[in-house]
């Protein structure tokens, strides 16, 4: 890791349809091989499907899903005197959001619906209702942190 310069954070523009920065970050995470228009159509298609099924505003469903997925604590490895301990640490807000987005996309890609729009729609609705594999990932992370609470005094 270079000690000379820290890469500065880039400004991102809010998405054109909802004017939300988090939706733009989500689109950028969905995007593969620089194909932004494909990512846009996937996200907006999933949002339209959520709106038609739940009769709710899709952005509020999206934000509640992210809140249900985002972890509060995680474990980090810390080496102390030849032993490696899994130390529970609090998660910074930016990392919480990034992990929630990453886990939501990974869970959607693992689902077995035919199109990515359907997978994403299903995972968003499941996560908003505290179900689904993305929420399970968060629960597992919290369980790991809870099981290793004895090592929390090694926190740095």
Curated annotation (Swiss-Prot):
Keywords, ordered alphabetically: Ribonucleoprotein, Ribosomal protein, RNA-binding, rRNA-binding, tRNA-binding
Pfam family, one: Ribosomal_S7
GO cellular component: a single term: small ribosomal subunit
SUPFAM superfamilies attached to this UniProt entry: Ribosomal protein S7
GO molecular function annotations of the record: rRNA binding; structural constituent of ribosome; tRNA binding
Stored PROSITE patterns: RIBOSOMAL_S7
Gene Ontology biological process terms, A to Z: translation
Family to which the UniProt record says this protein belongs: Belongs to the universal ribosomal protein uS7 family.
Summary of the function given for this chain in its UniProt record: One of the primary rRNA binding proteins, it binds directly to 16S rRNA where it nucleates assembly of the head domain of the 30S subunit. Is located at the subunit interface close to the decoding center, probably blocks exit of the E-site tRNA.
Subunit architecture: Part of the 30S ribosomal subunit. Contacts proteins S9 and S11.
Matching HAMAP family: Ribosomal_uS7_B
Protein's name in the database: Small ribosomal subunit protein uS7
Organism for this UniProt entry: Sinorhizobium medicae (strain WSM419)
Gene: rpsG
């Amino acid at each position: 890791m270079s000690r000379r310069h820290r890469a500065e954070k880039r400004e991102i523009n809010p998405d054109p349809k909802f004017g939300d920065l988090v939706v733009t970050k989500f689109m950028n995470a969905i995007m593969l091989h620089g194909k932004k228009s494909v990512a846009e159509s996937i996200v907006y298609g999933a949002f339209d499907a959520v709106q038609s099924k739940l009769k709710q505003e899709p952005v509020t469903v999206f934000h509640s899903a992210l809140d249900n997925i985002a972890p509060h604590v995680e474990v980090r490895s810390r080496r102390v005197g030849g032993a490696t301990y899994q130390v529970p640490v609090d998660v910074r807000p930016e990392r919480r959001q990034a992990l929630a987005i990453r886990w939501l996309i990974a869970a959607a890609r693992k689902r077995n619906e035919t199109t990515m729009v359907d997978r994403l729609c299903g995972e968003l609705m499941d996560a908003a209702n505290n179900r689904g594999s993305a929420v399970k990932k968060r629960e597992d992370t919290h369980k790991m942190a809870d099981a290793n609470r004895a090592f929390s005094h090694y926190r740095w």
